[in-house]
């Protein structure tokens, strides 16, 4: 590990952000700190994660939502101080790492199936 990677790892450890495990296809709520004049408040942004880029301190993800019938995408830096919290609403069942094809789709064709817990694991836990 070179010096830059080591410094990035130390910075990530120092930030100690509580980031949940999420993947493309998941519906998330990102609370962003917004400064308006002298006031600071948290603004919620809910949508589907269409991309995730894991690059250490430079990791980011793109969230897409439909606002007033128009598709809106926003890129968030994972370790940004502007992000107050990330909450996973539902898990999506997708087979791609980048869901850019959702940009051309609208309505029912843009929906993503929900990933349900595995039956075998649930049955095994119920038997115990």
Swiss-Prot record:
Signal sequence bounds: none
Keywords: Ribonucleoprotein, Ribosomal protein
InterPro entries referenced in this protein's UniProt entry, alphabetically: Ribosomal_bL19, Ribosomal_bL19_CS, Ribosomal_bL19_sf, Translation_prot_SH3-like_sf
Stored SUPFAM superfamilies: Translation proteins SH3-like domain (SSF50104)
Transmembrane region(s): none
Gene Ontology CC terms, in alphabetical order: cytosolic large ribosomal subunit
UniProt record, GO biological process: translation
Pfam families: Ribosomal_L19
Gene Ontology terms for molecular function: structural constituent of ribosome
Functional summary from the UniProt entry: This protein is located at the 30S-50S ribosomal subunit interface and may play a role in the structure and function of the aminoacyl-tRNA binding site.
Family: Belongs to the bacterial ribosomal protein bL19 family.
Protein name: Large ribosomal subunit protein bL19
Species of the source: Janthinobacterium sp. (strain Marseille) (Minibacterium massiliensis)
Species lineage: Bacteria, Pseudomonadati, Pseudomonadota, Betaproteobacteria, Burkholderiales
Gene that encodes the chain: rplS
